[in-house]
Amino acid sequence: APAAGFFGMR
């Protein structure tokens, strides 16, 4: 789930 990493960065 790459989306999780995106949200973590934001």
Curated annotation (Swiss-Prot):
GO terms for biological process: neuropeptide signaling pathway. The keyword Transferase does not apply. Keywords: Amidation, Neuropeptide, Secreted. Signal peptide: none annotated. It comes from the Eukaryota. The keyword Secreted applies. The modification Arginine amide is found at residue 10. It is found in: Secreted. GO terms for cellular component: extracellular region. Brain. Myoactive peptide. Increases the amplitude and frequency of spontaneous contractions and tonus of hindgut muscle. This is Tachykinin-related peptide 6. It comes from Rhyparobia maderae (Madeira cockroach). The lineage of its organism: Eukaryota, Metazoa, Ecdysozoa, Arthropoda, Hexapoda.
